[in-house]
């Protein structure tokens, strides 16, 4: 049986992703300038004109994706967002490490100090977990969710982005 056809596996994956991304968003939103904007600057990959807006928006995207996974609403969109963020985090950390620099990646903001050399090993498994949730059939992906409480006509309209 494929992992993405097992309701318990997909629910577990959703809760794991939710935990990590809600924790990450919280840690950055405590002091967004210090823990998100400065972390993006420290990577030195984005141009200065893009680093600040990216640092300001990223915690809110993490919050949206984490809430989507927790409540089972927009899970496909949330999983896609988590997968793309994990891929971009992996690439950014790989670039920094290839330059021989050691930085705090800012992954969990004020909650935990994290080095890019350590957290890079979590990015690809998180991406795999997110893609497993994204490709799960909707009856598996939405098992035990708030999405089941919506009227059926809304479910049909939202099925494409869910």
Identify the residue ranges that each predicted region occupies.
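Extended, low-polarity transmembrane helix blocks
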Residues: 1-31, 64-67, 71-162
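Solvent-exposed, well-ordered loop and adjacent helix/strand elements within mature globular domains
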Residues: 20-58
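Transmembrane alpha-helical segments of multi-pass membrane glycosylation machinery
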Residues: 56-66
């Amino acid at each position: 049986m494929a992992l993405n056809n097992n309701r318990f596996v997909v629910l577990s994956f959703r809760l794991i992703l939710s935990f990590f991304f809600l924790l990450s968003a919280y840690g950055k939103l405590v002091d967004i300038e210090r823990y998100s904007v400065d972390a993006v600057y420290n990577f030195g990959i984005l141009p200065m004109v893009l680093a600040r807006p990216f640092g300001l928006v990223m915690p809110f995207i993490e919050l949206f994706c984490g809430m989507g996974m927790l409540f089972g609403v927009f899970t496909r969109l949330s999983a896609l967002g988590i997968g793309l963020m994990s891929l971009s985090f992996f690439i950014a950390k790989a670039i920094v490490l290839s330059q021989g620099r050691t930085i705090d990646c800012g992954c969990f903001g004020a909650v935990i100090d994290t080095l890019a050399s350590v957290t890079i090993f979590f990015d690809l498994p998180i991406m795999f977990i997110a893609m497993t949730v994204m490709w799960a059939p909707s009856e598996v992906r939405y098992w035990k969710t708030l999405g089941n409480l919506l009227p059926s006509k809304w479910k049909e309209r939202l099925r494409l982005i869910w």
